[in-house]
Regions:
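Conserved end of the kinase activation segment
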Residues: 51-62
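Catalytic-loop of the protein kinase fold
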Residues: 1-13
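Regulatory extensions flanking the kinase catalytic core
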Residues: 153-175
């Protein structure tokens, strides 16, 4: 796991044909069973909700969340969730994706920083996320929705993301 994916850690060659990931200072090996890690990782705007809520047991889904926020930012030239504190960040996420319930994310209310006094935003499907995605077609919205799923185990994997219909017809040699 990289644990600090953000635009400034992505290096693109001058011709725009190669992407390299930089700054592995927070990276850790990932294995099963899941290990306990610090929750003080990832730059705020790209931090997954489980990390914001204090989980110390997490997996590669935190990087996929970051990929989703970067994907949005590349297309829209602004961060998807622009919080100014950890609580502000989780509120921005919940306002857009809805406050989770036990049905949508089992065990979320047991996370150390989750407060049942947090506002309860109810969102129908991905309507607010869809409204924010003015520069994506349906496939782009679908990919983003799967990347920034609140429930970590339901986020799309890197392998599945590369096979997503959004990339159908993509030819790297034509970039």
């Amino acid at each position: 796991m990289h644990r600090d994916l953000k635009p400034s850690n992505l290096l693109i060659d001058p011709e725009g044909k190669q992407l390299k990931i930089a700054d592995f200072g927070l990276a850790r090996t990932f294995g099963m069973p899941l290990k306990s890690y610090t929750h003080e990782v990832v730059t705020l705007w790209y931090r997954a909700p489980e990390v914001l809520l204090g989980s110390k047991i997490y997996g590669t889904g935190i990087d996929m969340w970051s990929v989703g926020t970067i994907f949005y930012e590349m297309a829209h030239k602004r961060p998807l969730f622009l919080g100014d504190s950890e609580v502000g960040q989780i509120f921005k996420i919940f306002k857009t994706l809805g406050t989770p319930t036990e049905e949508s994310w089992q065990g979320f209310k047991d996370l150390p920083c989750m407060k049942m006094t947090f506002p309860q935003w109810k969102v129908q499907g991905n309507e607010l996320l869809r409204k924010a995605c003015t520069n994506f077609d349906e496939a782009g919205i679908d990919l983003l929705t799967q990347l920034v799923h609140l429930e970590p185990s339901r986020r799309i994997s890197a392998k599945a993301a590369l096979r997503h219909p959004y990339f159908d017809g993509f030819n790297p040699s034509q970039v």
